[in-house]
Amino acid sequence: MAVAGVAKRYAQAAFAVAKEHGQLDFWEQRLTDLEALARDSAVEEFIQNPAIPLEAKVQVIDRLFPGDENRYVRNLLVLLLERGRWHQLRDVVVAFRELLREHRGVIDVELVTAVPLEPSEVERLRRELAQRLSRPVELRTTVDPELLGGVVLKIGDEVFDASVRTQLTNLRRQLVGAAA
């Protein structure tokens, strides 16, 4: 999932700070917390409430992320607050994760199947893809019954469609073309 614009710039700045201070692993752990914070409707309501002063909001962030190790995470959140961009926190998290995967050489792969796969099958496919691509693979699976069978594999911008639906569509085109 590509994130553009302002959220990506915030993520790039946060990533640069985390990398400079050797905190990439720490930030990776904090991303889950930030994601939960961004999804929490009570937090959103509190942050968006104009009757609550900025200082009170900053104090809450200080309590949620205490200690010196959280300083840069806290700075990012306060900056988003001050600039009226809190609503972009989720996109910042997504963009940061993309940068982290890219930095670590991880390839994002989506596997779409007609039926759910067993976890052991998914893990076997992930290992095989990692071996063939000579890079670590983050494999996400989704189910689309309309495929009828087979798989669709999305690696970066490339799509490998070996679904029964596509094969039937191609066969139909060939038959119609031959009949014309």
Swiss-Prot record:
Belongs to the ATPase delta chain family. It is found in: Cell membrane. PROSITE patterns: ATPASE_DELTA. The lineage of its organism: Bacteria, Pseudomonadati, Thermomicrobiota, Thermomicrobia, Thermomicrobiales. F-type ATPases have 2 components, F(1) - the catalytic core - and F(0) - the membrane proton channel. F(1) has five subunits: alpha(3), beta(3), gamma(1), delta(1), epsilon(1). F(0) has three main subunits: a(1), b(2) and c(10-14). The alpha and beta chains form an alternating ring which encloses part of the gamma chain. F(1) is attached to F(0) by a central stalk formed by the gamma and epsilon chains, while a peripheral stalk is formed by the delta and b chains. PANTHER family: ATP SYNTHASE DELTA CHAIN. Signal peptide: none annotated. Its main location: membrane. It comes from Thermomicrobium roseum (strain ATCC 27502 / DSM 5159 / P-2). GO terms for molecular function: proton-transporting ATP synthase activity, rotational mechanism. This is ATP synthase subunit delta. It is a peripheral membrane protein. One of its GO terms (cellular component) is plasma membrane. F(1)F(0) ATP synthase produces ATP from ADP in the presence of a proton or sodium gradient. F-type ATPases consist of two structural domains, F(1) containing the extramembraneous catalytic core and F(0) containing the membrane proton channel, linked together by a central stalk and a peripheral stalk. During catalysis, ATP synthesis in the catalytic domain of F(1) is coupled via a rotary mechanism of the central stalk subunits to proton translocation. This protein is part of the stalk that links CF(0) to CF(1). It either transmits conformational changes from CF(0) to CF(1) or is implicated in proton conduction. Keywords: ATP synthesis, Cell membrane, CF(1), Hydrogen ion transport, Ion transport, Membrane, Transport.
